[in-house]
């Protein structure tokens, strides 16, 4: 499994409570006074770091720094990106443990991890933005005023990291995600959807499948139009089930 790392391991291990924040993928250490460890990109923005790039956040406490890409530009910034795809360099057809803990590199394609996402939404209220781009360079987005992962569960994993979204706002992409609200997350090795077959295997990905999907943003990177049904990076309400998108970002910001 690829670890969800981008910054040098030595820097990660030395990042104590008073360590300077690391700005962008360059790893420039700025001289700052001792700051509270950031939970998310909202905190990082508030601390004065307002450039797009990779930063460290601490959703599970001070001993576990997590690299994350912060979008500080789009619509006022402060977005914590938890899913990013743009070139097919990272396989997203993975098992449960990878999706639970995260994989890829925060300066490239990556998945932040279901447990990290749960811990974030347990502590704050978030909105969600989904940015999409096709191979003809058309862009669209969808926004949701409320986003959370198993907010009331004693054990989020036993609850299946259930998705809750509401308050759709159209940015040209249409609503392909509300259909999935209330569903548990499924991978090919942990089938928790409502279909008699394995939706993750059929869709070549992992998602909050129902039976099966209108959104499949973790599907195969197929490079535009494809003959196979619904197993690419699909957002059905924008491009249907036979078009795999070029770029996707799923990101959250405090509401």
Curated annotation (Swiss-Prot):
UniProt KW keywords: Calcium, Cell adhesion, Extracellular matrix, Glycoprotein, Secreted, Signal
InterPro entries the record matches: Fibrinogen-like_C, Fibrinogen_a/b/g_C_1, Fibrinogen_a/b/g_C_dom, Fibrinogen_C-term_domain
Signal peptide boundaries: 1-20
Superkingdom: Eukaryota
Motif placement: Cell attachment site: 26-28
Main location group: secreted
CDD domains assigned: FReD (cd00087)
Residue stretches making up the Fibrinogen C-terminal domain: 32-255
One cellular component (GO) term of this entry: elastic fiber
Protein name, as recorded: Microfibril-associated glycoprotein 4
